[in-house]
């Protein structure tokens, strides 16, 4: 067990497939963990069992089951106007975090189990969004729900647009199909909000970011793996001074 510092605290988001932990010292994020189901036996609570914790769960595991001392955040805790009652708490927290760090208007592209786009307008109000199957989910669904199609991992480089085998045809659909969907939605966002910023986050962020590089100017978007943590931080201490987190820092924490 690590002796805690007095200003240390946890942020915790329990997702559909992973647990996301962050260790803060005051307002500074010092370490993160993104745990798969196989890794849950070694969660950070073993080393820091008595720290305060603020968090939320959108998965099947309740927050208190993972960390009994945790303060559970709800949608009602997020002062974001125009949210609908069934908006995913993870989406709301990520959007709230993006607003604190990057300002408005903003579109959060979360490339997780689902691929979601969540918007805030220039009045810092929730302005709608989109829910699509995640790119990994699309790949698995083709293999799981058809008799003859194989599982094809996400392409690591642009494939041929017109596949000449089953595998290359699926790879093309995953790559160019997802790119076309994102381009259509993000073009519409930037047409409506010319000063808007796009922030990419989530487990498949590297793949989605590669797609955005093919059609979106670099000054219109950035990457940030910690939007939910910024949102939790802002709810824990609304008066805290928020520092910027440029995209080159996203892999600083492990």
UniProtKB/Swiss-Prot annotation:
Protein name (Swiss-Prot/TrEMBL): Type III pantothenate kinase
Its subcellular locations are: Cytoplasm
Q: Which Gene3D superfamilies match?
A: 3.30.420.40
Residues binding substrate, per UniProt: 84, 88-91, 166
What the protein does? Answer: Catalyzes the phosphorylation of pantothenate (Pan), the first step in CoA biosynthesis.
Assembly description: Homodimer.
EC code: 2.7.1.33
**Keywords from the UniProt entry:** ATP-binding, Coenzyme A biosynthesis, Cytoplasm, Kinase, Metal-binding, Nucleotide-binding, Potassium, Transferase
Report the GO molecular function annotations: ATP binding; metal ion binding; pantothenate kinase activity
Annotated pathway: Cofactor biosynthesis; coenzyme A biosynthesis; CoA from (R)-pantothenate: step 1/5
Q: What's an example GO cellular component term for this entry?
A: cytoplasm
Q: Where is the active site?
A: 90 (proton acceptor)
Task: Report the record's disulfide bonds.
Answer: none
Which SUPFAM superfamilies does the protein's record reference? Actin-like ATPase domain (SSF53067)
According to its UniProt record, this protein's enzyme class is transferase
| Cofactor list | NH4(+); K(+)
Q: Which family does it belong to?
A: Belongs to the type III pantothenate kinase family.
Q: Which NCBIfam families match?
A: baf, PRK13331.1
Residues involved in ATP binding = 13-20, 113
Task: Write down the chemical reaction(s) this protein catalyses.
Answer: (R)-pantothenate + ATP = (R)-4'-phosphopantothenate + ADP + H(+)
Question: Mind listing the GO biological process terms from this record?
Answer: coenzyme A biosynthetic process
């Amino acid at each position: 067990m690590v002796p805690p510092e007095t200003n240390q605290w946890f942020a915790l988001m329990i997702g559909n497939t992973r647990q996301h932990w962050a260790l803060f010292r005051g307002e500074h994020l010092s370490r993160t963990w993104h745990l798969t189901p196989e890794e849950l036996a070694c969660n950070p609570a073993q080393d820091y069992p008595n720290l305060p914790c603020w968090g939320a769960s959108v998965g099947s595991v309740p927050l208190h089951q993972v960390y009994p001392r945790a303060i559970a955040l709800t949608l009602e805790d997020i002062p974001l106007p125009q949210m609908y009652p069934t908006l995913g708490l993870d989406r709301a927290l990520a959007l709230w975090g993006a607003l604190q760090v990057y300002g408005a208007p903003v579109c959060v592209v979360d490339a997780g189990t689902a691929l979601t786009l969540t918007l805030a307008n220039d009045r810092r109000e929730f302005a709608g969004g989109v829910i699509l199957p995640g790119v990994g989910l699309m790949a698995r669904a083709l293999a799981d729900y058809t008799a003859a199609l194989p599982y094809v991992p996400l392409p690591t480089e642009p494939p041929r647009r017109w596949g000449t085998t089953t595998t290359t045809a699926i790879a093309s659909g995953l790559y160019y199909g997802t790119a076309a969907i994102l381009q259509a939605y993000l073009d519409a966002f930037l047409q409506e909000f010319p000063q808007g910023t796009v922030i990419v986050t989530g487990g498949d962020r590297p793949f989605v970011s590669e797609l955005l590089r093919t059609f979106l100017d670099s000054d219109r978007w950035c990457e940030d793996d910690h939007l939910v943590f910024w949102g939790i931080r802002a709810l824990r201490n609304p008066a805290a001074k928020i520092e910027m987190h440029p995209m080159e820092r996203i892999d600083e924490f492990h």
